[in-house]
Each structure stands twice: as structure tokens, then as C-alpha cells.
Design a protein with these regions (language model features):
Chain B
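C-terminal cap of thioredoxin/glutaredoxin-like
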Residues: 2-67, 96, 192-266
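Basic/polar, acidic-poor N-terminal "presequence/leader" segments
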Residues: 41, 75-80
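Juxtamembrane extracytosolic/periplasmic "stalk" immediately C-terminal to the first targeting helix
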Residues: 67-77
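A short beta-strand-turn-helix
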Residues: 79-96
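A generic local structural motif
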Residues: 82-87, 117-119, 222-224
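Structural alpha/beta surface segment adjacent to cysteine/selenocysteine redox centers
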Residues: 94, 102-104, 110-194
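Processing junctions and N-termini across compartments
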Residues: 100-103, 230
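Short beta-strands and strand-loop turn motifs
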Residues: 101, 134-135, 206, 234
Length: 144, 266
């Protein structure tokens, strides 16, 4: 494999963002399983979002999907960063794009349907979007 | 590969080495971007994403009013009816009273009712330490442009259920079947289904609801709550100490135990 120039910086940042997303998803899942609202601090909205019907999909907490997704994404990012595996980069790119679509939909639900913003969910969405943007740049540079 | 020992250290040198190691003929004849799988991945993932999103919008968008008369969800932790006393539950001489101003349409009230209160029932109500009293604060329905106020109607149904000694089963079933706000979750047909599931004499219950006096009572108690400073749901009060919003079982438990231990509370 060719060790393309931006791999180090981009790999680190992508992995860090994927792990940040994983941490948030694990926290939200733990709060859900414990039956307690996520701690929002002075910002309100987490309780409303967590209690809404959209917090589960087919009876499964949405946070569980987030945990699974972030684990796979983090593995792909690490594989590219540490092993220069180009397939892993493309996997991260595809997963990231799916993640961006998913968080865009969930953010739409928060703003326009539930009428409340959960800062944890917003943080997760930000990590996914920025992570995917980095992945897209890295993939473009790698393939160019 | 033995090339590894000669990997150029700077970015420019690596790029130069890559150019050198590449195949100039291929680079000239075909744009390298065209060989990239990015476009293919974007197309496939984007296409699948759009299809899945459309499915979700149809599935979740249809889970409100259109599902109103479909099968109801059973309460996960039904309130022990033996401890019920109208819209209160627990011994009348319990040292601590938790008053709750609630709205059947409020999602956080739903979380309080389905996750926190059942734990409090087990830990404090059953042993006789706590009495929980529910009050109406029917705010959410006012956000609807419809003349049918789902918060008020659900609350009225609860009062008529209380007339039959079954407020708590009704509230358990109602909160277990929240489905959006002002979207038909508490349409008359669905409330009737809930009343049936809660074990009420439905004809008597319907006659009670039809008089409109229960709705007036809900609105009156809501006005009293507003006058007393309640402007959000759920609002709670433990022996006079006001708590706005949801709290964990542990947090409420600490307040309950403190109130029970205090001379005025005990």
C-alpha cells in the first residue's frame, strides 16, 4: 500500500472523532438502559428527545444503532490510519456518508418534529459530519 | 518489500517517488479520478440512504393517528391497584407526599410515569413511606389548532376512570401508548380502546366523558396550577419542595428519604 501524505493527521483526527461519537453513543445507551434522562446541564431538551417515540426504532434504542455504527467506523478509521488499508478508507467513507444521512434525519426530527435539541445528539452528529468530511478529503487525495 | 527501507521522508519526496513508481501511460490515458470508487460508493450509499429514509418517514410518520386504533402497548410496570386512592396512590398517612403536575401528552411525563414512578412505587409507596398524588397540567393540547384538545380529553378520561376506581390502570395504559403530541394518539376512538384495556366499564366511562364536566375540571385544575406557578410539566413537589422536570429515581429517592427523616416530614 502507498502511504499517502495526509494519512497521519487525517487518520488521527478521523479516529478521534469516531471514538468521540462512540463515547457519546455509549453514554446515551447507558442512560436509556438505566431509565434515566441524559444529563443536559443547563441546556434543556435531552429529556424530551430521550423520552420521544423517536428514541427507539423497531423497539431498539437508537443509541444502540449509534454504538454499533461507531464501533465499525472506528475500526475502519484505525485500519486506514495504522495499516494504510485503502479499502478501510473507502469503507469509512461509505459508512460516514450513511451516518451523515442518518444524523441529518435525526436532527430534522429533533428540530421540526420533537421540537427539542439534545446536545449529546448534536455532538454526535457533529462528530459524524466532520469525521466524514475529513474522510472524504482523505479519500479524494488518496484516489487522486 | 525491500522498498520500505528507502521510503522518502518528506511529502514532496514521497509524491515524487509515487509518480516515479507509477505508470505514466495509464495516467495519461485515463483520468485517475475516474478509477476512484468514491463515485460508486457515494451513489450506492446515497441511493440506499434515500430509500431507507423514505421508509422511515412512512413508518414513523404513520405511527401516530393512523395507528390510533391498532393494537395498544401494555404498560411495562402496572401500578399496584391495591394502593390506589383516586388519583393518589399510597397510604393516606404516609410521611412523604409527592405531588405531580402532569400532562398525558408530555413525553417527559411519560418517561416519569413509565420508568421513574414504578421504581418509586416499589421502593417507597409499597412500604408506606410515600404517597403520590397526580394533578392535571394539561398544557400540550393548547399547541394544537384543533378544537379537540388531546391533553384535556386524556385527562378527562382519567377523571372518569377515577370515578370507577381505576385511575392508575388508565394512566398506565395512556402513558404506555403515547405517540406524538396532537397527532391523534388520544383521539376519542383510541382513548376508548385505552379505557377498555384498562378494565373500565366503557359505557359508563363514555357517558362520563360525554358530559364535559371532567374536561371542565381538567381545565380548572390546569388554571389553578398556572396560578400557583406551574408552567412546565412534569412539575413535582415533595413535602412542599418544588422540582421542575424529570429527576432520576436516585435523586428523588434522596429527597424522599430526607423528607421522611426530617421532623416535619416524619
Amino acid at each position: 500500500m502507498i502511504d499517502t501524505p495526509p494519512r497521519g493527521r487525517f487518520g488521527r483526527a478521523m479516529t478521534a472523532l469516531a471514538l468521540a461519537g462512540l463515547g457519546i453513543a455509549i453514554y446515551l445507551l447507558a442512560a436509556r438502559l438505566l431509565g434515566e434522562p441524559p444529563a443536559c446541564g443547563p441546556v434543556k431538551g435531552c429529556e424530551t428527545v430521550a423520552a420521544s417515540e423517536y428514541a427507539t426504532l423497531f423497539g431498539v434504542p437508537v443509541a444502540l444503532f449509534g454504538v454499533g455504527f461507531s464501533v465499525v467506523l472506528a475500526f475502519a478509521c484505525v485500519a486506514w490510519w495504522r495499516r494504510a488499508d485503502r479499502r478501510a478508507l473507502y469503507t469509512a467513507y461509505g459508512l460516514g456518508l450513511a451516518g451523515v444521512i442518518a444524523v441529518a434525519y435525526l436532527t430534522y426530527l429533533e428540530i421540526f418534529v420533537i421540537g427539542a435539541i439534545c446536545v449529546w445528539c448534536a455532538g454526535y452528529a457533529l462528530a459524524i459530519v466532520v469525521g466524514w468530511a475529513l474522510t472524504a478529503v482523505a479519500a479524494w487525495r488518496t484516489s487522486a | 518489500m525491500n522498498k520500505a527501507s528507502n521510503v522518502p521522508q518528506t511529502r514532496r519526496a514521497r509524491r515524487a517517488a509515487e509518480r516515479e513508481a507509477g505508470h505514466p501511460s495509464r495516467r495519461r490515458t485515463a483520468p485517475r479520478r475516474g478509477r476512484s470508487p468514491l463515485l460508486l460508493i457515494t451513489g450506492i450509499v446515497g441511493g440506499i440512504g434515500v430509500v431507507v429514509l423514505a421508509g422511515l418517514v412512512l413508518f414513523q410518520g404513520g405511527s401516530g393517528a393512523t395507528d390510533a386504533t391498532s393494537e395498544l402497548i401494555s404498560p411495562r410496570a402496572p401500578t399496584p391497584v391495591a394502593l390506589a386512592d383516586g388519583r393518589a396512590v399510597g397510604k393516606a398517612d404516609a410521611p412523604v407526599t409527592l405531588e405531580v403536575w402532569t400532562d398525558f401528552q408530555c413525553p417527559v411525563c411519560g418517561q416519569l410515569a413509565t420508568t421513574v414512578e414504578p421504581a418509586l412505587m416499589t421502593k417507597y409507596v409499597t412500604p408506606g413511606v410515600l404517597r403520590i398524588v397526580h394533578h392535571d397540567a394539561a398544557f400540550q393540547g393548547a399547541k394544537s389548532t384543533s378544537s379537540y384538545d388531546e391533553s384535556v380529553e386524556a385527562g378527562a378520561g382519567a377523571r372518569c376512570a377515577a370515578d370507577q376506581g381505576r385511575y392508575w390502570p388508565y394512566q398506565d395504559w395512556t402513558f404506555a401508548n403515547q405517540a406524538g403530541e396532537n397527532e391523534g394518539a388520544y383521539a376519542a376512538t383510541r382513548l376508548t380502546a385505552i379505557a377498555t384495556a384498562a378494565g373500565l366499564d366503557v359505557e359508563t366511562w363514555q357517558a362520563c366523558v360525554a358530559t364535559g364536566s371532567a374536561q371542565k375540571a381538567v381545565r380548572a385544575e390546569t388554571s389553578q396550577a398556572v396560578a400557583a406557578g406551574v408552567n412546565a410539566t412534569p412539575t413535582m413537589s415533595i413535602n412542599g419542595q418544588t422540582i421542575v422536570g424529570l429527576r432520576s429515581v436516585a435523586d428523588l429517592g434522596a429527597l424522599i428519604e430526607a423528607a421522611a427523616a426530617s421532623p416535619s416530614g416524619g
